[in-house]
């Protein structure tokens, strides 16, 4: 029983702690994402071509380096062999090698002069043949022109003769130059041969004794020259293979940069709005339709102006109605003459601090219409309205003073400029309200005087 329990416990999967499990799940998710990206993205066909070039260049470089190393090793081995054998032979021959060196040097110079003279002779012969062929062409052209009975000398014939003449002149110049070079080389060759014969007669015994040494030296010299030429060719081929390898690497690097840039742009996605611009996006088309919301001060000032003007209009209407009841004049207010001065509309109110609409209502109580008073045309009603206006003016001045005190207290002792500006604004507001109340009282006095005049009349 115990063994069965142990076996069942051992077969149960071991639960990992939460951090280890999360890390393992994260790694598995990253691996799946990488595999998915690799499967989704197709391999750029340019990569395959550049990789083939890179592999081919690598093989060429390895092969050329091996061949170059073998050629250099062979050159060094031949050089060592020639040095050892020539030293042994020089020791065997003795002093005759040093004595016969001038002769062999003169012989080498004569051989070089002979080769130059042969080359100059070939150039001279070639120039002579070209000159002869050009002269024959001109003679044949002239002969055909003379044999023709019509003798039509057209532009094509003239152009052919011009080319033939030009070739003759060039051939003559080439022949002259080659002739001069041939003479110079022939002179050097004759001088070298004369010196060689002179030394041969003088050093005949030493020359015969050291001849095996210099013949072996010439043999190794020719062999070393051939090996040196092979090494130079292999070095040029190796440099070419390295250039191809470098070009393939640059191409692969450029393709890799393009792929990484494309992946980065795809991962970033389209560019969105800046920080803080998510909730306040307003299109250009909706700009004309959007209107700024009025603040509390502007709403209060507009309400105050509308109520004052409404009160003035209602008072004018009531007075007009009372006048029309006592007189037989015009029955509509529009037919009455303009006897009352126009009341100036107050401008926008500039308060020293933000004031809500309810506070503004407390500061400036709005008078009700004149019709609400019991005695519309009685002097008691006029006195009551005057008391209301005076009370409203007193409350307004008290409220403005309180606002000035509050604003000056909140500003602190270090803001003298803000306090002075606040007090000036409060004084300007008080002066403006006094002017408005005076204008309203003047309008009422004029209306009362007109009513009394009508009643007396």
Curated annotation (Swiss-Prot):
Residue runs in coiled coils: 46-92, 99-147, 156-202, 213-257
Tree of life domain: Eukaryota
Residues covered by region (Disordered): 1-68, 308-347, 371-427
A GO molecular-function descriptor: SH3 domain binding
Annotated region described as Sufficient for interaction with RAB11A and for guanine nucleotide exchange activity, given as residue ranges: 33-267
Keyword Mitochondrion (UniProt): yes
Residue ranges with Acidic residues bias: 25-43, 308-319
Residue stretches of biased makeup (Basic and acidic residues): 1-12, 44-53, 382-398
Quaternary state and interactors: Interacts with BTK. Interacts with all isoforms of MAPK8, MAPK9, MAPK10 and MAPK12. Interacts with GDP-bound and nucleotide-free forms of RAB11A.
Role of this protein: Functions as a guanine nucleotide exchange factor (GEF) with specificity for RAB11A and RAB25. Inhibits the auto- and transphosphorylation activity of BTK. Plays a negative regulatory role in BTK-related cytoplasmic signaling in B-cells. May be involved in BCR-induced apoptotic cell death.
Comment field on protein domains: The N-terminal half of the protein mediates interaction with RAB11A and functions as a guanine nucleotide exchange factor. Four long alpha-helices (interrupted by a central kink) assemble into coiled coils, giving rise to a 'V' shape.
Protein name: SH3 domain-binding protein 5
Organism this protein belongs to: Rattus norvegicus
Gene name for this UniProt entry: Sh3bp5
């Amino acid at each position: 029983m115990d063994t069965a329990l142990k076996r069942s416990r051992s077969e149960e999967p071991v639960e990992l702690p939460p951090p280890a499990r999360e890390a393992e799940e994260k790694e598995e998710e990253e691996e799946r994402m990488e595999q998915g990206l690799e499967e989704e993205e197709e391999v750029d066909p340019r990569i395959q071509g550049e990789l083939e070039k890179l592999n081919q260049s690598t093989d060429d470089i390895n092969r050329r380096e091996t061949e170059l190393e073998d050629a250099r090793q062979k050159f060094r081995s031949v050089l060592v062999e020639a040095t050892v054998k020539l030293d042994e032979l020089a020791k065997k021959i003795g002093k005759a090698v040093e004595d016969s060196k001038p002769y062999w040097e003169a012989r080498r110079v004569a051989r070089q002069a002979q080769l130059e003279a042969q080359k100059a002779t070939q150039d001279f012969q070639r120039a002579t043949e070209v000159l002869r062929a050009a002269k024959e062409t001109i003679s044949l052209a002239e002969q055909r022109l003379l044999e023709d009975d019509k003798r039509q000398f057209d532009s094509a014939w003239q152009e052919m003769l011009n080319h033939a003449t030009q070739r003759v002149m060039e051939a003559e110049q080439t022949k002259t130059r080659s002739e001069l070079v041939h003479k110079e080389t022939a002179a050097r060759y004759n001088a070298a041969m004369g010196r060689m014969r002179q030394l041969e007669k003088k050093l005949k015994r030493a020359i015969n004794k050291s001849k095996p040494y210099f013949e072996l030296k010439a043999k190794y010299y020719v062999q070393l020259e051939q090996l040196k030429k092979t090494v130079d060719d292999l070095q040029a081929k190796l440099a070419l293979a390295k250039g191809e390898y470098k070009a393939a690497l640059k191409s692969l690097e450029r393709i890799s940069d393009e792929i990484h840039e494309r992946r980065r742009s795809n991962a970033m996605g389209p560019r969105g709005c800046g920080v803080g611009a998510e909730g306040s996006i307003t299109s250009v088309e909706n700009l004309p339709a959007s209107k700024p919301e009025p603040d509390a001060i502007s709403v209060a000032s507009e309400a105050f102006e509308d109520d004052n003007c409404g009160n003035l209009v209602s008072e004018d209407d009531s007075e007009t109605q009372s006048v029309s009841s006592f007189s037989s004049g015009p029955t509509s207010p529009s037919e009455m003459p303009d006897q009352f001065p126009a009341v100036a509309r107050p401008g926008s109110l500039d308060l020293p601090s933000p004031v809500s609409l309810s506070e503004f209502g407390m500061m400036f109580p709005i008078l009700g219409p004149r019709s609400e008073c019991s005695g519309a045309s009685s002097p008691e009603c006029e006195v009551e309205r005057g008391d209301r206006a005076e009370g409203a003016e007193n409350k307004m001045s008290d409220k403005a003073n309180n606002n000035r005190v509050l604003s000056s207290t909140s500003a602190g002792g270090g803001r003298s400029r803000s306090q002075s500006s606040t007090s000036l604004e409060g004084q300007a507001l008080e002066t403006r309200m006094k002017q408005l109340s005076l204008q309203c009282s003047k309008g009422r006095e004029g209306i009362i005087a007109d009513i009394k005049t009508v009643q007396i009349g």
